[in-house]
Amino acid sequence: MLRIITQQADVKAELQRICDRTHDEQVLHKEATVREVLQAVKRQGDKAVLHYTDEFDNQILKAEELRVTGSELDAAYQQVSQELLEAIQLASRQIEAFHRQRVPKSWVHFGDDDIVLGKRYTPIDRAGLYVPGGRAAYVSTVLMNAIPARVAGVPRIVIATPPGAQKAINPAVLVAAQEVGVQEIYRVGGAQAIAALAYGTETIPKVDVITGPGNIYVTLAKKLVYGNVGIDSLAGPSEVLIIADEGANPVHVATDMLAQAEHDPMAAAILFTTDPALAKNVQVAVERQLVDHPRRIDTEKAIAHYGLIVLVESLDAAAELSNEFAPEHLELEVKDPWAVLPNIRHAGAIFLGYSTPEAVGDYLAGPNHTLPTSGAARYASALSVETFLKHSSIIQYSQTALNKVAGAIDALATAEGLPSHADSVKRRIQQDE
């Protein structure tokens, strides 16, 4: 059952327990398996990818079957409803419109003495997007990862996603990929997919950045290949924190909590409220909705282990506790969310008001739903166009400008014991003279 505790209880310790749920010994023990997979793929390429696809996904593939064919891509459109296709297209338009507003611009500044300083943004060459399989067809994951990469101008975007029964990829995933311009899709999942994207194989290209969520094996693999390639983040199980007052609808709050819990048995769903009646009503509503929930077993586990209702003294107190937890998703289900918002410092995405459930942001509002988890919102942000861009500094000095700073550079280089640094300036000054 969903627990109710008061702020006077050891709330911070309980929140820390939930935040640390991916750091237990059982999870860390899996790192050895992931290291083995990474090394095998690095050494053996396609052979290892095929071996682990058989072992972990129970699908026997040949190397030539790794890439989804053009005929499979075409056939996918016949297997999705017109309603779903139109929803994908609507979401694509809105996500693209938002991300196009966030493209950073290169710039240069022309200063005194013909000094030119600036910053130049360029896209990476190749992006690898991981799309989970298994529990659902993660159409939104395709959109939220591929669209920012495309807007950034990445010339080659590839998707890796695990094969299902009979080697099939969910047609909705294939349609979503094509709608956002991705035709290169590989049927490979898990740590072996991350290894293939990081190191390259005979069939799967090595990429520059890997993005997209996955299970603990995928997350550990991304952690271990970081440095060889860039990654978006180390995504843990999903989480929502709801701050609600007496005006919130308990059935709506309960549904929002279950919407998070249904993701994964380790997902977290937390409510902070000033109203004891709301707390009790939400507790009852959660139990009622669980009775015939299609994902009852996993959802019930998440609620039992990582679900929590905390009675707080004030909305200010709720905001401060929220900042310590730094949730992936934060819902402000209060009468005046704009009054609470200034007190929020750490959250991946913030949903304002009674009519803005997290699902709006998950699917089509526009902002990215790939967000920092497990407290990482204290220092990290959502996936964005900049995930797929690099920036280079632009510097040009005239001889006049160099002459003016030569003494300072000489002093700094000498202090650091780097004589050739100093000489690289002094010889240009001598040459000018």
UniProtKB/Swiss-Prot annotation:
Annotated residues that bind Zn(2+) are located at Q260, H263, D362, H421
Cofactors per UniProt?
Zn(2+)
Q: Residues that bind substrate, according to the entry?
A: S238, Q260, H263, H329, D362, E416, H421
Any idea which UniProt keywords this protein has? Amino-acid biosynthesis, Histidine biosynthesis, Metal-binding, NAD, Oxidoreductase, Zinc
User: Which segment of the chain is annotated as a signal peptide?
Assistant: none
Q: Where is the active site?
A: E328, H329
| Catalytic activity from the UniProt record | L-histidinol + 2 NAD(+) + H2O = L-histidine + 2 NADH + 3 H(+)
List the transmembrane segments.
none
Pathway(s) annotated for this protein in UniProt: Amino-acid biosynthesis; L-histidine biosynthesis; L-histidine from 5-phospho-alpha-D-ribose 1-diphosphate: step 9/9
Record GO biological process: L-histidine biosynthetic process
Task: Write down the InterPro entries for this protein, in alphabetical order.
Answer: Ald_DH/histidinol_DH, Histidinol_DH_CS, Histidinol_DH_monofunct, Hstdl_DH
One Pfam family hit? Histidinol_dh
Instruction: Look up the record and report any one GO term of the cellular component aspect.
Output: cytosol
For whether the record's keyword set contains Oxidoreductase, the answer is yes
Q: Does the keyword NAD apply?
A: yes
**Sample GO molecular function, one term:** histidinol dehydrogenase activity
Mind telling me which HAMAP family this protein's record contains?
A: HisD
Question: Its biological function?
Answer: Catalyzes the sequential NAD-dependent oxidations of L-histidinol to L-histidinaldehyde and then to L-histidine.
The name on file for this protein is Histidinol dehydrogenase 2
Its taxonomic placement starts with: Bacteria, Bacillati, Cyanobacteriota, Cyanophyceae, Nostocales
